[in-house]
């Protein structure tokens, strides 16, 4: 692809989300969501592979259907209330439809079946964009609507996402599918923060984005597409592979890594508000994710000695981590000591 066209596609990918995040009118928000979908489709299809074409088609259908639901609900709401403002009062029916549509855009369970398949059909960098930047605009709309969201629906979808993201990831061997189910599990925690403490939603989202960027850039640098690829990655760059495993455990929420910070704050708020059963369920739901991360780290670092392998892989290649990997990896591993400061400011 022509570098100028590629630069244009990347640049065009940024304004739609900004339009949605800064809008107070439902039509502008819907326009930003649609442009956001259309801007990433050429990036998905860049590899000219049948899997990429299939992923782009699925992504277009799902996102367009969700945007149509949002437009339908906002039109009905404007007809009944006489305004198009996002933060103003809405009817229960339209708010429920909007919530379901935004859950579909986020890939939250039970509307999650499209999410792992699409990530499996794209490149690592495209999967990174789908799991991070594409989540910002729908999350912003949910944050603007948090006073009107149906609490029961949010709790059910949050717990379901955390459970399905953890237990379904146990049987996966593809790293992109593992990251997909990790994203679904983190979406469940994000929904719980929307219901309980909206001021923690931004912190949870930023922490998730930092950990995901660090993990995806590390996987892309080491060219790890399956768990079996770790057998040769260890001989390439032991340090980078160790940091990758630590970032995966941070995604699982293992203390004393950064991923434990938002989970600690969410569980603390749940206990303070006398929702101990929900807190226990969320904590137990995070254990399967942590289990397959630790299992992956154990199989990689403790059972594979650093010896030369007689395989077709280019094991003599020594990948150099990108500057983005170094920065985000540092934040992924070392931000937990700032938790007391967050207690003082929230």
Predicted regions and their residues:
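Core, highly hydrophobic multi-pass alpha-helical transmembrane subunits of bioenergetic inner membranes
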Residues: 1-346
């Amino acid at each position: 692809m022509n570098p100028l066209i590629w630069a244009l596609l990347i640049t065009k990918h940024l304004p739609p989300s900004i339009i949605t995040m800064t809008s107070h009118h439902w039509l502008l928000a819907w326009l930003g969501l649609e442009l956001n979908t259309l801007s990433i489709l050429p990036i998905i299809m860049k590899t000219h592979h049948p899997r990429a074409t299939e992923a782009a088609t699925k992504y277009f259908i799902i996102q367009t259907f969700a945007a149509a639901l949002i437009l339908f609900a906002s039109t009905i709401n404007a007809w009944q209330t006489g305004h198009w403002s996002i933060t103003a009062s809405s009817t229960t029916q339209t708010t429920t439809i909007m919530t379901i549509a935004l859950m579909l855009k986020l890939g939250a369970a039970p509307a999650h079946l499209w999410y792992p398949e699409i990530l499996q059909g794209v490149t690592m960098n495209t999967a990174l964009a789908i799991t991070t930047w594409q989540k910002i605009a729908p999350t912003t709309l949910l944050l603007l609507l948090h006073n009107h969201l149906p609490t029961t629906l949010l709790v059910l979808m949050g717990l379901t996402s955390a459970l399905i993201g953890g237990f379904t990831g146990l049987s996966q061997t593809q790293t992109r599918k593992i990251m997909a189910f990790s994203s679904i599990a983190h979406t469940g925690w994000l929904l719980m923060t929307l219901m309980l403490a909206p001021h923690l939603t931004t912190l949870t989202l930023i922490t998730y984005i930092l950990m995901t960027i660090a993990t995806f850039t590390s996987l892309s640098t080491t060219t790890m597409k399956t768990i079996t690829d770790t057998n040769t990655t260890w001989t390439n760059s032991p340090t980078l592979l160790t940091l990758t495993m630590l970032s995966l455990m941070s995604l699982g929420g293992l203390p004393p890594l950064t991923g434990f910070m938002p989970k600690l704050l969410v569980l603390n708020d749940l206990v303070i508000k006398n929702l101990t059963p929900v807190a226990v369920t969320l904590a137990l739901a995070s254990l399967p994710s942590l289990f397959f991360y630790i299992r992956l780290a154990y199989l990689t670092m403790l059972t594979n000695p650093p010896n030369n392998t007689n395989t077709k892989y280019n094991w003599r290649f020594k990948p150099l981590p990108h500057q983005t990997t170094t920065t985000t990896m540092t934040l992924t591993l070392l931000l937990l000591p700032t938790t007391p400061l967050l207690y003082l400011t929230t």
